[in-house]
Amino acid sequence: MSKRLRSSEVCADCSGPDPSWASVNRGTFLCDECCSVHRSLGRHISQVRHLKHTPWPPTLLQMVETLYNNGANSIWEHSLLDPASIMSGRRKANPQDKVHPNKAEFIRAKYQMLAFVHRLPCRDDDSVTAKDLSKQLHSSVRTGNLETCLRLLSLGAQANFFHPEKGNTPLHVASKAGQILQAELLAVYGADPGTQDSSGKTPVDYARQGGHHELAERLVEIQYELTDRLAFYLCGRKPDHKNGQHFIIPQMADSSLDLSELAKAAKKKLQSLSNHLFEELAMDVYDEVDRRETDAVWLATQNHSALVTETTVVPFLPVNPEYSSTRNQGRQKLARFNAHEFATLVIDILSDAKRRQQGSSLSGSKDNVELILKTINNQHSVESQDNDQPDYDSVASDEDTDLETTASKTNRQKSLDSDLSDGPVTVQEFMEVKNALVASEAKIQQLMKVNNNLSDELRIMQKKLQTLQSENSNLRKQATTNVYQVQTGSEYTDTSNHSSLKRRPSARGSRPMSMYETGSGQKPYLPMGEASRPEESRMRLQPFPAHIGRSALVTSSSSLPSFPSTLSWSRDESARRASRLEKQNSTPESDYDNTPNDMEPDGMGSSRKGRQRSMVWPGDGLVPDTAEPHVAPSPTLPSTEDVIRKTEQITKNIQELLRAAQENKHDSYIPCSERIHVAVTEMAALFPKKPKSDMVRTSLRLLTSSAYRLQSECKKTLPGDPGSPTDVQLVTQQVIQCAYDIAKAAKQLVTITTKENNN
């Protein structure tokens, strides 16, 4: 396969890049994840092969590539290409989708249910429709249009259809026309190369008469594909059909199973099976060989990046609904056979297939017809099961059964003697070493990947630790350099002398400090009736460095849902809030519509938008609120340190509430809401009963009302009337909204307090 062709290929099911598997009967290429789902469906739905690590007949691979390049995938996704399918909500899987359930459900609908295949108009008789389709297939195989034939086969055309007027099958027509790729496609869908037409000729005869020698040789290989695959599984070689040799039969030498009466009885019952039952058993063993070989390739090609992956494991043959329950159960029990037992069964099948093909007679009497699977399964005496148990039971682990002890253990080596081999070949050793090597390589890759992941995580943790230590050191330095110095004597004036205080212009270029930054330094607490001069605050306050803009305490809640943290915000957010405080009116950020949005006249008498009423110093002529005329408005606010300390308590309790919501611990809602309410009450008590600023009043109102709403919503989680169940999901949304409002109000109060106290 050319590199240019392979680089442009994508998975037919999820459009992932660089597919490494192929579905032979569907004409598509698959990625690893989609292939795992195909394997779980069974070979009757999808026949998967690895593009590099599986031996391919050249013409078979060419047939799959031709189908893929000619758009065979559009056959299985016909309705998805219709624009109307977008309106119906159906869509194709994406590479980022999870294997379960997204990709698995789509693949089952696409190939097992054929939900997206173009449907013909309904007719009263389905047999007439199938007959018409088969006649169209009979006419199409003489051309090289593979996609048309695959479309007819997907609609129900029969690959072995015998044309009543022409007296032959589609494979006869394709062989006579020399269409080797059409012959490959028909053989995949069950066409028999040994079928004779009305003249007694086979497709091989027509291929040789037409001079298509490569096609004739390939048809012979297809005719012996089952026995060739079984022989190749045991000894890694295939017969030389060109020279007339069609069977390679390894012989078990000096084996205890061959000498046991149980093995002799099993072999005798195998020989007594009718041709029909023997064909069924041989096909089941062929499917089991395909499963084991695909398993070996699967383990060797996976990177084992995780201890548990989403990809599907296929421990035994999947159920085929066209087979009986007894046959499906017997097919699944083939997975119990260890390497030696399965090799013995394969050799017996090869021997009897050769005998039946050559027409040799049996010596001895014939027993009653009975499936060989039931007899050989009696060797597992410890794991014996009743046939009345439910079908498709789980297959036990592949543990080898101890063989009967013999007199000399040194003479127990089991070897295979092929009729063309130069020396003995040990089946058990070959299979055990092969399986052990594959398992060891997979384990090594898995451990190396896990080791690399752990090393990467360790490096990341070390970097995070160094970053936290550096930030902690910087914060300590800033705390020592920015401590407010408590001045004595004339640095504070009597608050009664309001004329000595002047309003300081707002510093538009500075950004408001985050709550964690402000809390790092210690500022003297001013009583309710006192305030520091703006000039002195301006001289003593130094801005924090730009790199300290986010609190390290919030990292513990990074796994919680998106939530406005009251402990930190980004530099851009801080600058935006500072600009909003200085340039806009006094309306705070709120989700409610009853917030006042009016103008305040400045000292010159002109109405200007953007003057902050909360940034007013005593003596500026405040107008008392008419709501409570007996309470005089207070011009002072609590210290920033006290507000931050209470806000941190609120934030900690909100984080506990959100963790409870994330973990569905609804019984923790009420205790968390009570702790939040207590913290909110303590924070509200810091502020005067009648604050001067509209922003402070609005934020306090939002803070307290949201706390009461939170308690009310959390009480809804208590078990109530059984007739009216509570929608827990809706309650959780309301609880999160209330917590959001509380955090938002607390952040507004911190911003206002920080701005006021810095002026």
Swiss-Prot record:
Transmembrane segments: none
Highest taxon in the source lineage: Eukaryota
Modified residues (Phosphotyrosine): Y484
Span of zinc fingers (C4-type): 11-34
Residue stretches making up the Arf-GAP domain: 1-124
Coiled-coil ranges (or none): 437-478
Skewed-composition ranges (Acidic residues): 385-403
Region annotated Disordered, chain positions: 379-422, 480-538, 554-643
ANK repeats: 132-161, 166-195, 199-228
GO BP field: brain development; regulation of ARF protein signal transduction; regulation of G protein-coupled receptor signaling pathway; synaptic vesicle recycling
GO MF assignments: GTPase activator activity; small GTPase binding; zinc ion binding
Keywords, sorted A to Z: ANK repeat, Coiled coil, GTPase activation, Metal-binding, Phosphoprotein, Repeat, Zinc, Zinc-finger
Ranges of compositional bias, category Basic and acidic residues: 570-583
Description of how the protein assembles with itself and partners: May form heterooligomers with GIT1. Directly interacts with protein Piccolo/PCLO. Interacts with PPFIA1 and PPFIA2. Interacts with ARHGEF7. Identified in a complex with ARHGEF6 and BIN2. Interacts with PAK3. Interacts with PXN/paxillin. Interacts with TGFB1I1. Forms a complex with EFNB1 and GRB4/NCK2.
PROSITE patterns named among the record's database cross-references: ANK_REP_REGION (PS50297), ANK_REPEAT (PS50088), ARFGAP (PS50115)
Entry keyword annotation includes Zinc: yes
UniProt name for this protein: ARF GTPase-activating protein GIT2
Residues modified to Phosphothreonine: T401, T587
Protein task: GTPase-activating protein for ADP ribosylation factor family members, including ARF1.
UniProt biased composition (Polar residues): 480-499, 584-597
Start-end of Low complexity biased regions: 555-569
